[in-house]
Regions:
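Feature detects amphipathic, helix-rich regulatory segments
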Residues: 1-208
Length: 208
């Protein structure tokens, strides 16, 4: 999808503006080192291809569900609740992270989806579910943090493989990031970047 020069210039201006403001904002508050594995309870998916049913209730989150814009791609894959899938049904505010990439460039590896509703999605193999510790962290904030380029850069560096790369959760769960422990500040940061995302999406839609 092509974005016009005018829209591109506007978007770049917004990014520069927030990049300029954001450092002064974040360093005025308390940030702590936190390991990826400490933000919530993590569990890996299994192969559920045998359960695929075109008339199923649940949307399936698999490697093809992740996009470079961090939005869910509906591939039309469905399952029902069965003995095999029932433990992999996601809850609202869960995060899912893709641990594989179909290419060596790492366009989607480490990207995260924020689940927006209860009892609607099931996660497949190659995805790690993170049940956020909501006493400490806001899921919307972690969604923005984990999809940031500098966050994903660490994950890409930890990847293995050649034509198709992958990471092990056990390895990347030890990666440390600076995170504010103030939920009020988490909320403000999440809102800033959610607004930026919305503006970018709006400008892209205007190209059609």
């Amino acid at each position: 999808m092509m974005v016009s020069y005018a829209s591109s210039t506007t978007i770049q201006g917004l990014i520069r503006k927030f990049t300029y403001i954001f450092p002064f904002f974040i360093y005025s508050i308390s940030w702590e080192q936190c390991k990826l594995g400490d933000i919530g309870k993590a569990s890996g998916g299994i192969s559920i291809e045998s359960e695929f049913d075109e008339f199923g209730k649940y949307k399936v989150i698999s490697i093809g569900s992740y996009s470079v814009t961090n939005k869910y791609i509906d591939q039309g894959i469905r399952v029902n609740k069965t003995e095999k899938t029932e433990n992999y049904i996601l809850n609202k505010n869960d995060l899912t992270m893709i641990l594989n990439d179909k290419t060596a460039s790492g366009n989607i590896i480490g990207r995260v989806l924020l689940i927006d509703t209860d009892d609607s999605y099931v996660f497949n193999q190659r995805t790690e579910r993170i049940e956020v510790n909501e006493d400490e962290y806001l899921p919307e904030f972690l969604y923005q943090l984990l999809n940031a380029d500098n966050t994903r850069a660490k994950i890409i560096l930890a990847s293995q493989g050649n034509t198709q790369i992958y990471v092990n959760w056990r390895t990347i769960s030890k990666l440390a990031y600076k995170i504010t422990m103030s939920k009020d500040e988490q909320s403000k940061i999440a809102k800033i970047f959610t607004n930026v995302d919305n503006i970018i999406t709006l400008h892209q839609r205007k190209q059609f």
